[in-house]
């Protein structure tokens, strides 16, 4: 074969490859490397579905945690997730190269009243069905706490009810490819209470959503201790920063408070955590917080730097 023919074939192959890649094979535009970061839609209650997807895509997020949409916390009833719309919704998620990290319900499992308990478990099942339809791995539930209960820790009867609820929901979720995760929150913030409940639930379809802020801020636990106690159950995590202490503690932009976020991340890394590092900005509950356009983008920058540079995490 002559040299000119070889050159022609080489150029032809290059041209064909460039065409398959939409003409971008040799352009300066390269696909952004996405880190395992996510944000909860709790932080952007005014955004519509398209803005949620576009913002996540543009700021390098890999996933979204669904916790309400356009002010509607009852996600299964939102039109975006209706039977006739959900396939389009899934396509839109894929087109932005995103995943759904978790579908977060409001279900509380502490109730002793039979009717209230049945309602909470029923709501959790609806969210499990939605997660299964979306291909999401987890549904969040709460242990919860009576508003009139001033005790620091749940009693044995409450722990038993919560564990039984988790086990029941795990049995429902498992065959649907979903796991139920209890969040470190309310009465179930300290490692000891969570460990008791997770052990009693005794299900491979039950795990923990480690809201890393609450055990530190409310239970005075260092992240290394919490992860040592509960690491084998951690499936998903919430990260957020705050300043102050006790009742005076206020949420602030990531890195501007006194929550040891870098140590929390390193503690998860130390156990080979493979989940998402999810920003939960409680804009729904605290409307005076910074707007999500600022706070969520800031989280992507600060935690993205931490994940991309071990030295930035103190390790």
Named regions from a protein language model:
Residues 67-88, 144-149:
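Glycine-rich, proline-tolerant flexible connector loops at the mouths of alpha/beta enzymes
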Residues 23-47, 51-55, 59:
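C-terminal segment of N-terminal export signals and the immediately downstream linker at the start
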Residues 34, 63, 103, 164-258, ...:
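Acidic/histidine-rich catalytic cores of soluble enzymes
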Residues 65, 102-104, 140, 238, ...:
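Conserved beta-strand positions in the central sheet of alpha/beta enzyme cores
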Residues 39, 56, 64, 93, ...:
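Conserved, mostly hydrophobic/aromatic
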Residues 1, 7-28:
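N-terminal export signals
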Residues 40-44, 69, 105-108, 144-146, ...:
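Active-site beta-loop-alpha junctions enriched in small/polar residues
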Residues 11-20, 51, 87, 92-102, ...:
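Active-site acidic/histidine proton-transfer and metal-coordination neighborhood
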């Amino acid at each position: 074969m002559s040299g000119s023919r070889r050159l022609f074939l080489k150029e032809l192959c290059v041209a064909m490859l460039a065409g398959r890649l939409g003409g971008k094979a040799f352009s300066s535009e390269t696909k952004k490397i996405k880190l395992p970061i996510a944000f909860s839609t709790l932080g952007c209650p005014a955004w519509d579905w398209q803005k949620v997807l576009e913002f996540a895509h543009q700021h390098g997020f890999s996933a979204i945690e669904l916790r309400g949409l356009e002010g509607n916390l009852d996600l299964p009833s939102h039109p975006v997730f209706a039977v006739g719309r959900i396939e389009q919704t899934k396509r839109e998620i894929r087109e932005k190269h995103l995943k759904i990290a978790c579908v977060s319900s409001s279900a509380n499992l502490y109730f002793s009243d039979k009717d209230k308990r049945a309602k909470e478990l029923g709501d959790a099942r609806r969210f499990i069905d939605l997660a299964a339809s979306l291909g999401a791995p987890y549904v969040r539930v709460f242990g919860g706490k009576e508003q009139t209960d001033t005790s620091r820790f749940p009693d044995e009867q409450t722990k038993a009810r919560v564990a039984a609820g988790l086990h029941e929901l795990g049995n429902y979720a498992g065959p649907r490819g979903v796991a139920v995760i209890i969040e470190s929150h309310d009465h179930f913030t300290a490692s000891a209470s969570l460990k008791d409940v997770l052990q009693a639930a005794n299900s491979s379809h039950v795990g923990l959503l480690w809201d890393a802020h609450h055990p530190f801020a409310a239970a005075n636990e260092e992240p290394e201790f919490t992860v040592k106690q509960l690491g084998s159950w951690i499936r998903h995590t919430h990260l957020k920063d705050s300043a102050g202490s006790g009742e005076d503690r206020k949420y602030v932009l990531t890195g501007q408070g006194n929550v040891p976020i870098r140590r929390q991340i390193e503690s998860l890394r130390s156990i080979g955590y493979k989940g998402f590092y999810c920003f939960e900005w409680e804009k729904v509950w605290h409307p005076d917080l910074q707007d999500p356009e600022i706070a969520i983008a800031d989280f992507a920058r600060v935690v993205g730097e931490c994940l991309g540079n071990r030295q930035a995490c103190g390790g």
